[in-house]
Each structure stands twice: as C-alpha cells, then as structure tokens.
Amino acid sequence: MAKVKITLVKSLIGRKKDQIATVNALGLKKIGNIVQHEETPQISGMIKKVSYLLKVEEA
C-alpha cells in the first residue's frame, strides 16, 4: 500500500466534536503537524471527512 503524508493546515477551533476527534485519531494536534499513514480505506475515509483542514501528499 502507498503511504500518505498528512499535514494539519487549519485550526480546530470552532469545529464540531466529531471532526476534532477525527483529526486527533489521525495523530494531528497542532497546525503544521505532519504524520505518515498507510493509505487504507479507513484512513482515506478520515481524510475525506476533514479534507478542508488537511494537506495530503504521497510520501
């Protein structure tokens, strides 16, 4: 499977609790944090849910 590099680019202030929980489940806490994950259906769904807060690149 391919790896993806995910960066949090927008703040979580004022977001719904489920969106904050999704970002935290991806391992992101602060703006500018970067994590790498395998591109599984679960991770893809989480990225889709909060895509407007993230920057996603191939790793």
Swiss-Prot record:
Keywords: Ribonucleoprotein, Ribosomal protein. GO terms for cellular component: cytosolic large ribosomal subunit. The keyword Ribosomal protein applies. One of its GO terms (molecular function) is structural constituent of ribosome. One of its GO terms (biological process) is translation. Pfam families: Ribosomal_L30. SUPFAM superfamilies: Ribosomal protein L30p/L7e. Part of the 50S ribosomal subunit. Belongs to the universal ribosomal protein uL30 family. This is Large ribosomal subunit protein uL30. It comes from Clostridium botulinum (strain 657 / Type Ba4). The gene is rpmD.
